[in-house]
Curated annotation (Swiss-Prot):
Record's protein name: Ribosomal RNA small subunit methyltransferase F
Keyword S-adenosyl-L-methionine listed: yes
Biological source species: Shewanella sp. (strain ANA-3)
GO annotation, biological process: rRNA base methylation
Enzyme class (EC, first level): transferase
Enzyme Commission numbers on file: 2.1.1.178
Gene: rsmF
Residues annotated as the enzyme's active site: 241
Family stated for the protein in its record: Belongs to the class I-like SAM-binding methyltransferase superfamily. RsmB/NOP family.
One example GO MF annotation: rRNA (cytosine-C5-)-methyltransferase activity
Protein location: Cytoplasm
């Protein structure tokens, strides 16, 4: 049973729009959330994914504000996170309302090349934006919590997002270190989580207005930092999964009061069919749970109309960046290895070298070298030794899919496996082959045309090369439905 604190109810009763009823709000908070997922278009299309899953009993209801988002229903009670298709990165389990902020930032005419996600983990919005950018440009994903950075990186890797750079900082430093550097910024701010009560019945049990006001002060500092990091003419989206005005409208009003006409609010009333039901007088989206039968959420969009003064002197550039750009000879060698041995044509990105490691960075990252310390940049392609190159798993996941999808295998050694074999592979086991043949060495293991990783073809079996930290204890095969 959902626990709604009486002080919270009293506060919401004063803020709830006149056309909505408190009884409907409480009833909506008491209902379980509908299951929702987002198809990962970096690896598949929504139509192909539906064709794959409908025989397994899935039904799909489109989410109005996300072209590749769906409410789903199916008979299985198992955890979807263990599903083979989820481990492959074909979809992300994402609450419908949380798909709103990237949609608001990436309206049809947006062509953002440098984007900041200020509070990224676990990665739902980061990977949604990576898909909207189609792995072009640069997406800087920041997370303050060290443990959550690991989760963020795992999801970025699983979804094949190759143009991300991960950072681990308090979001309040970005306005200083990366002043007016980004075309667009998303800040899904840490918040009181009032909108999440449908999946966490105790979320509001100890709610207090004092805590709300304390959180809002942090949010004001974060939105100001995000605004300072935004280029003039750029767009900023501020969102929370909470419902009170202090953390939502109040934070946006603070920014406008601080920077005046440099802050121009943009109306989201036409963002999707039905958006007007949740639009505030300022043009923000205040999604109460009963409006769309979803989590409660808040989304605001603004444009930075002009440059504003920085608050701190420009920091000195950091020295000793550990990567150097590959020489023409090095670049040619790694390109030939990927093309000849793997059938993968490397994208026209920056090939970088650190010791014996070869990496692929977005070109846009050049402008950020020395300005801030990054935890992870782009994709690690391969290690080099006297025996030659050894491809890295993340490169196969991020880059092989496009080659296979286009049918451009170019003589690559690819082994397509069954669902049972895919399960065994993801659990770290070797795969016996029905017919013994000539050993082929390193091969790309695929299921349903999408790469799972690498293996060594020994003639009578595939010797598993999946990194140990990616081995699963359980893999769920969703059965066909009668």
């Amino acid at each position: 049973m959902v626990q709604l604190n009486q002080n919270f109810i009293n506060t919401i009763a004063q803020e709830l729009p006149a056309h909505l009823s408190m009884d409907d709000f409480i009833a909506a908070c008491s209902r379980p959330l509908r299951r929702s997922i987002r198809v990962n278009t970096l690896k598949t299309s929504s139509e192909d994914f539906k064709r794959l899953m409908q025989p397994k009993g899935w039904t799909f209801e489109p989410i109005p504000w996300c072209e590749d988002g769906f409410w789903i229903s199916y008979d299985e009670e198992e955890q979807l996170g263990n599903a083979l298709e989820h481990i492959q990165g074909l979809f992300y389990i994402q609450e419908a309302s949380s798909m709103l902020p990237p949609t608001a930032l990436f309206t049809p005419n947006a062509d953002w090349q440098c984007v900041l996600d200020l509070a990224s983990a676990p990665g739902s919005k980061t990977t949604q934006m990576a898909a909207l950018m189609n792995n072009q440009g640069l997406l800087v994903a920041n997370e303050y919590s060290a443990s959550r950075v690991k989760v963020l990186h795992a999801n970025v890797l699983r979804m094949g997002a190759s143009h991300c750079a991960l950072t681990h900082f308090d979001g309040r430093v970005f306005g200083e270190y990366l002043y007016e550097s980004f075309d667009a910024v998303l800040i899904d701010a840490p918040c009181g989580g009032e909108g999440t009560v449908r999946k966490d019945a105790d979320a509001l049990k100890s709610w207090s207005l004092d805590e709300v006001i304390e959180i809002s002060e942090t949010q004001k500092a974060l939105i100001e930092s995000a605004f300072l990091a935004l280029k003039p003419g750029g767009s900023l989206v501020y969102s929370t999964c909470t419902l009170n005005r202090h953390e939502n409208q109040g934070v946006c009003e603070y920014l406008q009061q601080t920077y005046g006409d440099a802050v121009q609010f943009e109306s989201l009333s036409q963002l999707f069919d039905g958006a007007e039901k949740a639009t505030t007088p300022e043009g923000f989206l205040h999604v109460w749970p009963q409006i769309y039968d979803s989590e409660g959420f808040f989304v605001a969009k603004l444009t930075k109309t002009r440059s504003v003064p920085r608050l701190q002197p420009e920091p000195k550039l950091q020295k000793n960046f550990p990567f150097t750009e590959a020489s023409a000879k090095q670049a040619k060698a790694i390109q030939a290895y990927f093309a000849d041995d793997l059938g993968i044509e490397l994208p026209d990105d920056l090939i970088m070298v650190r010791d014996d490691e070869f990496w692929l960075f977005p070109h846009e990252f050049r402008d950020f070298i020395g300005k801030m310390r990054f935890q992870r940049i782009g994709v690690k392609l391969a290690d080099h030794s006297k025996h030659g190159f050894k491809v890295r798993h993340e490169a196969i996941i991020a880059l092989a899919g496009k080659a296979l999808k286009a049918g451009a295998k170019n003589g690559a050694k690819v082994v397509e496996v069954s669902d049972e074999q895919a399960k065994e592979y993801l659990m770290g086991r070797d795969i016996p082959l029905d017919t013994a043949g000539k050993a082929q060495g390193e091969v790309i293991v695929c299921y349903g045309g999408a790469p799972l990783g690498m293996a060594k073809h020994l003639g009578n079996k595939l010797k598993n090369s999946l990194p140990r930290d990616l081995v699963k204890d359980k893999v769920l095969l969703l059965p066909p439905q009668a």
